[in-house]
UniProtKB/Swiss-Prot annotation:
GO terms for cellular component: cell surface; extracellular region; phosphopyruvate hydratase complex. It is an enzyme of class 4 (lyase). Mg(2+) binds at residues 241, 283, 310. SMART domains: Enolase_C (SM01192), Enolase_N (SM01193). (2R)-2-phosphoglycerate binds at residues 162, 335, 364-365, 386. The active site is at residues 204, 335. This is Enolase. Pathway: Carbohydrate degradation; glycolysis; pyruvate from D-glyceraldehyde 3-phosphate: step 4/5. It comes from Mycolicibacterium gilvum (strain PYR-GCK) (Mycobacterium gilvum (strain PYR-GCK)). Its cofactor is Mg(2+). GO terms for biological process: glycolytic process. Its main location: cytoplasm. PROSITE patterns: ENOLASE. InterPro entries: Enolase, Enolase-like_C_sf, Enolase-like_N, Enolase_C, Enolase_CS, Enolase_N.
Amino acid sequence: MPIIEQVGAREILDSRGNPTVEVEVGLLDGTVARAAVPSGASTGEHEAVELRDGGSRYLGKGVEKAVEAVLDEIAPAVIGLGADEQRLVDQALLDLDGTPDKSRLGANAILGVSLAVAKAAAQSAELPLFRYLGGPNAHILPVPMMNIINGGAHADTGVDVQEFMIAPIGAPSFKEALRWGAEVYHSLKSVLKKQGLSTGLGDEGGFAPDLPGTKAALDLIGTAIEGAGLKIGSDVALALDVAATEFYTDGTGYAFEKETRTAEQMAQFYEQLIGAYPLVSIEDPLSEDDWDGWVALTSAIGDRVQLVGDDLFVTNPERLEDGIERGAGNALLVKVNQIGTLTETLDAVSLAHHAGYKTMMSHRSGETEDTTIADLAVAVGSGQIKTGAPARSERVAKYNQLLRIEEELGDAARYAGDLAFPRFGVESK
């Protein structure tokens, strides 16, 4: 059995220049593995708590308290446990913290240990992480949902929608999908330059031009797809992350595109969009606690487009189960740091799949070079991954890892392609 012998932690920087936690786990057999924890910009109210130091150091965003929690409390609790007993290790972490939202030790401390333990166990077993976690049937490469125009909390512009994504669903392989995405990305840069628009980048590597609204951004992307010699819809579909909680005020409504709108008016807007553009997915179209609005929206357009719960579900099995029972959404966004342990993440994915919900593996806007989510996407067969534009090394690291996995799988590899969205026939519009 691969016994945990050492647990270390340090403060490192993420892609936004803010501190985050990195954990190293050493086993008795000499194996050493490392995991770094991401951090979000638009965070759901119901996410597990990220422990920050406060004070003047790093403008209050230091994580020395979380590092100390790993070294002083977590390490003694897990040393001596088997790294291949992931559920047992994660339960020990939950019991030690003792709070429902991981606010005592911090989800950033707990997750770092949870992921590093899994990576150490995989290395000790001489298995790639995707194979260790997913078993012999893990072979599906996800569609890269590339965020090529950044708005909302990810950019300092007037665009309310947070992410405009392309989904190369018609590609024959992940390798080709990545090429298509990169070519559309470069085509978009040329389109923006020709129109005198900014080619500055947002947090996730996408361009951040100041545009009049959602339709203008989608039109630009459509032009870029055609400029890359691809067909909009059948080759490359479109997707949005609206992050509607960011512009929702309780009692007032949605302050969207210079108007105050109700949930019903937002639903009408989305219905118009999916009629005009080949949209396969809309994430967080309504606020995280607007359950009635979500249920009505799902009833209205859920048979025509994927409706992804991010802030709504926060990768939490309990909130997801509530949503499934209500009929809210039809897909789960998976962010490991929203819930804080690998076991709970896997439980949420399993619950979603058993209920017929799709899953999309996701990065955070504050990322590191850690590639765990790439392996995790293949391990659970999510069929979709979003990890930013094909730019900035913390984003590209995940795409490059998926290239390696596809190569390692060889003839057994299958690219999810348009089957990632089996209920939604997408044609050029």
